[in-house]
């Protein structure tokens, strides 16, 4: 029997995780790109030979979810240090230059997106504007002392981490809960960040099985691990295409995260 006190605690927990109280229609991909059908050890980095920004079959549905999250969960999905604003604005300008090749229309009064939405370009809110234009999330990392630090982000589709806990922290702190991210991998990733060159983006991807297809899955490092973590028996396959590139003026590193979720039946054989 549940005590009254336990009931109140449960209600409080739900209040702090409102996204769990409103089930959404699953936003699923039906296809997995050919170059994401293999497995590689961390960090599994390779040169990006195609476009680093993409528009795919789930664009419309994912963008509707992003718009809703930017309205309802802005404090959880947006972060920008004032000192990082020039880098964020530089990233926005770069993204705008890439959009016409992806089917966007650039007009004096804003952007016409592939799903028909008209988005005003607000340079005073660069991360929010990026979140309204693109499927992928963007994380800004800038070098401070010996490490890159998270100085800005739009993170609508977190996979079991919370932006507010990682904001302003260095790479090693950001990856502390990840079991595979040991000291050797941390050193390799920091060397990788130091070596990223302008105009030569790199990419990798991860592979996780989830019980829940919801794209917005923030989880505190202090909360229990999600159900099914480290198991390959879940009904949904979640993978992130993670692209790294360096901005020319600010020298910031951009971490672009394009999320795909597939039902198990639609996942092709992985080699």
Say what each PLM segment does:
Residues 1-21:
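N-terminal amphipathic/basic-hydrophobic helices that include classical n-h-c signal peptides
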Residues 16-271:
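Extended, well-ordered protein cores
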């Amino acid at each position: 029997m549940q005590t009254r006190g336990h009931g109140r605690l449960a209600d409080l927990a739900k209040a702090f995780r409102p996204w769990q109280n409103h089930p959404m229609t699953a936003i699923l991909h039906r296809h997995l790109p050919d170059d994401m059908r293999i497995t590689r050890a961390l960090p599994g980095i390779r040169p990006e030979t195609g476009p680093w920004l993409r528009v795919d079959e789930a664009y419309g549905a994912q963008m509707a979810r992003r718009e809703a999250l930017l309205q309802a969960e802005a404090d959880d999905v947006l972060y920008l240090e004032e000192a990082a604003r020039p880098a964020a604005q530089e990233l926005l300008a770069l993204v705008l230059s890439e959009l016409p090749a992806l089917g966007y229309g650039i007009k004096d009064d804003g952007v016409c997106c592939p799903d028909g939405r008209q988005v005003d370009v607000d340079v005073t809110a660069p991360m929010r504007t990026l979140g309204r234009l693109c499927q992928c999330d963007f994380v800004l990392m800038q070098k401070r002392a010996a490490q890159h630090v998270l100085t800005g982000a739009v993170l609508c589709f977190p996979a079991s981490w919370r932006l507010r806990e990682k904001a302003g922290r260095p790479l090693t702190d950001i990856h502390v809960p990840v079991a595979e991210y040991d000291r050797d991998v941390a050193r390799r990733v920091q060397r990788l960040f130091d070596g990223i060159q302008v105009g030569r983006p790199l990419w990798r991807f991860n592979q996780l099985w989830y019980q829940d297809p919801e794209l917005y899955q923030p989880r505190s490092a202090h909360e229990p691990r999600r159900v099914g973590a480290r198991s390959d028996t879940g009904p949904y396959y979640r993978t992130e295409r993670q692209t790294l590139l360096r901005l020319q003026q600010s020298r910031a590193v951009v971490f672009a995260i394009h999320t795909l979720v597939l039902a198990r039946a639609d996942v092709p054989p992985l080699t």
